[in-house]
Swiss-Prot record:
It comes from the Bacteria. GO terms for biological process: 'de novo' pyrimidine nucleobase biosynthetic process; 'de novo' UMP biosynthetic process. This is Dihydroorotate dehydrogenase (quinone). Its main location: membrane. Binds 1 FMN per subunit.
Amino acid sequence: MIGQLEHLARRGLFLFDPEAAHGLSIKALKSGLVPSCAAPADPRLGQTVAGLVFSNPIGMAAGYDKNAEVPEALLKIGFGFTEIGTVTPRPQAGNDKPRLFRLVEDEAVINRLGFNNEGHGAALARLKACSREALIGVNIGANKDSADRIADYVTGIRTFYAVARYFTANISSPNTPGLRDLQARESLSALLSAVLAARDDEARKGGRQVPVFLKIAPDLTEEGMDDIAAEVLAHGLDGLIVSNTTLSREGLKDRRQANEAGGLSGKPLFEKSTAVLARMRKRVGPHLPIIGVGGVCSAETAAEKIRAGADLVQLYSCMIYEGPGLPGRIVRGLSALCEREKLASIRDIRDSRLDYWSGRNV
């Protein structure tokens, strides 16, 4: 019955422009119209990562709930954690519309939204109303016209410190001109120094250390990956998120929209993002937490991220095609995998296909 409702809801939403459909889905979650398909708790899926206790490894990626409108509603439908944002200090409209495109044949999305959001103030007010137990991360970015982008990230740390369970510094969106330049070694070193100094200062004041993750692009050279790994380890960062959207259009079936500018996400991103994940795991070693994201559409693809080196997994675009029951289905599938393979913990499969994925030429 739930599957039929999801199918009908998807058909209805696909009658709308993608951005309008996104807004309607937020309203549905706010109103409680989305039924919970959460899976039963399974201790084999729980784990502690970066000092945080996760009930299951499946999270909602940043980009869906940009303004912190529905974080707790997302947790109720089966996600183990959720990440709001990207939020910038000042509100900004983002790029001109249309800026969001469905590639239905590929089960993919191209976006050039450009960090459209209501700013720190609006998101902070909403997060203050959330339970302190809710596992909500805050994805921070810089305003497009900022004179000092690093200062914008520092402002994000200080503004949300009391309400964030973790932070993600997003330096890998392709839709803010020059933002990916912060992945270059000298710039990245300056950013990490400033962000972690702000975090440590806030921790001294409040007695609680909030972990900071870095979200990177999948379109990195081998040298670029070397530089990021070196700086992340040198600065003692808490973790990585691999990866953001790609500029590549390789292998797409839907050629009508493939030439739209912006970042590609969804199923076609899976192989590329998973290969980069494995290569980064090889570079940073076994202990640094990594969240794998990109093309996760099923329990099998989620498990494959873990086999390639991820501790946790996020998704977003595939839920557009699979519906709000997707996180629950994935969690049930991971429980079934643990049962089938007699695993004490889902962590037992981590890195089991690390060599395969790190060697993939994608």
